[in-house]
């Protein structure tokens, strides 16, 4: 298994083959029409961005995870994956805990947020495992009126030491 900075082709490959639920979630938040246009848009937007990573195995890329600054101290966390996510899920979770969370601490993040379509409980449970808290429901946020939940980690709520591994459940 590998976890490294993503190449544009890898972003495209994961995006064009992403899980149906991921497609519905991300497509609801973008101007694109259809899977090809969405994949091309994600490739163009994320393909050369520094904080975009790919996780995969010998068969190819499986997951793209990114963290993007929205403004000083505020970051957005995102992820999309193929149907083979379970093959790298535990490995990826460990990489996020060991690599991405410390990077966000070093960047002095005081807020990390993520929006996820209502009803995607598998992902909501995982976000909570990572230490994000369910904050609110944003009604009608999607282009077809879909409701989304906002999950966040806020330094003030976590204490002055930041988003430390000690504040996150131990990963098996």
Region roles according to the model:
Residues 28-49:
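Active-site rim helix/loop that mediates acceptor-substrate recognition in acyltransferases
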Residues 77, 140-172:
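C-terminal "cap" of GNAT-fold acetyltransferases
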Residues 88-104, 129:
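Conserved acetyl-CoA-binding loop-helix of GNAT-fold acetyltransferases
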Residues 49-54, 64, 148-150:
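Short hydrophobic/aromatic beta-strand element in the GNAT-like acyltransferase core
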Residues 1-18, 22:
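A short beta-loop-alpha structural element at the N-terminal edge
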Residues 54, 59-69, 75-78:
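Conserved beta-strand in the GNAT
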Residues 112-128, 140-143:
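Conserved beta-strand-loop-alpha-helix junction that forms the acyl-donor binding cleft
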Residues 72-86, 92:
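Conserved acetyl-CoA binding element of GNAT-fold acetyltransferases
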């Amino acid at each position: 298994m590998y976890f490294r900075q993503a190449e544009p082709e890898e972003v495209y490959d994961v995006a064009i083959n992403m899980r149906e639920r991921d497609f519905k979630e991300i497509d609801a938040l973008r101007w694109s029409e259809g899977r090809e246009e969405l994949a091309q848009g994600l490739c163009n937007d994320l393909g050369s961005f520094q904080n975009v990573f790919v996780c995969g195995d010998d068969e190819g890329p499986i997951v793209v995870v990114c963290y993007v600054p929205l403004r000083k101290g505020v970051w957005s966390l995102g992820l999309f994956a193929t149907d083979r996510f379970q093959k790298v899920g535990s490995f990826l979770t460990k990489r996020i805990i060991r690599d991405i969370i410390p990077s966000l601490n070093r960047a002095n993040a005081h807020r990390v947020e993520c929006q996820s379509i209502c009803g995607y409980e598998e992902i909501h449970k995982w976000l909570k495992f990572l230490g994000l808290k369910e904050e609110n429901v944003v009604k009608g946020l999607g282009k077809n009126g879909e409701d989304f939940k906002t999950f966040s980690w806020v330094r003030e709520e976590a204490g002055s030491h930041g988003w430390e591994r000690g504040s996150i459940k131990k990963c098996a």
